[in-house]
Amino acid sequence: MVAHTSGTLDIDVISNFPEAGVFYPLQSFSRINPLQNKEFPICVEATRSDNLHSLKELAAKLVGVGSVYELNTIQRKAVHLAAVFASNYSNHMYQIAEELLKREDLNFDILRPLIVETAEKVKRMNPKEAQTGPAKRGDVKVMQEHMRELEPDPDYKALYTLISNSIIKRK
């Protein structure tokens, strides 16, 4: 069997192999930093049921049975897109936050407890319930002040507006 590990590629990209599969670990991997959390989902798919069983067994040995998901290509692509929002975009927000703090000679460490608590909240409740902040409260005065502070950064200002409006629409 030949399997790929992509969250976005269709299983058909390896259809020239009669026994094809997908073994997609849903985790953020970095060349610089080794993986800290060994608990993560593995999504599997195969063209044959015996190969699917083999992929499930391998995944279960690595992460446990409860973290193995049988997903078709459409479902896997949806998971990957959601993961980009949840992981890649949130990390980019951390980068922006760090830049904003550095302007005032502040260290990113001041935000780490907030980041951890936010992540812990979404373990206990759904993200909509966990949402806080001026956009959620409809605090126009604070949002206007933030917009003034972001005047030197049109991209950050546009991003702030876009995300705030998205939060307001989903209140």
What is the meaning of each model-derived region?
Residues 4, 45, 136:
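Active-site-adjacent beta-strand anchor residues
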Residues 11-17, 100-102, 150, 167, ...:
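Alpha-helix C-terminal capping segments
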Residues 31-34, 76, 136, 140:
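Short capping/connector residues at structural and topological boundaries
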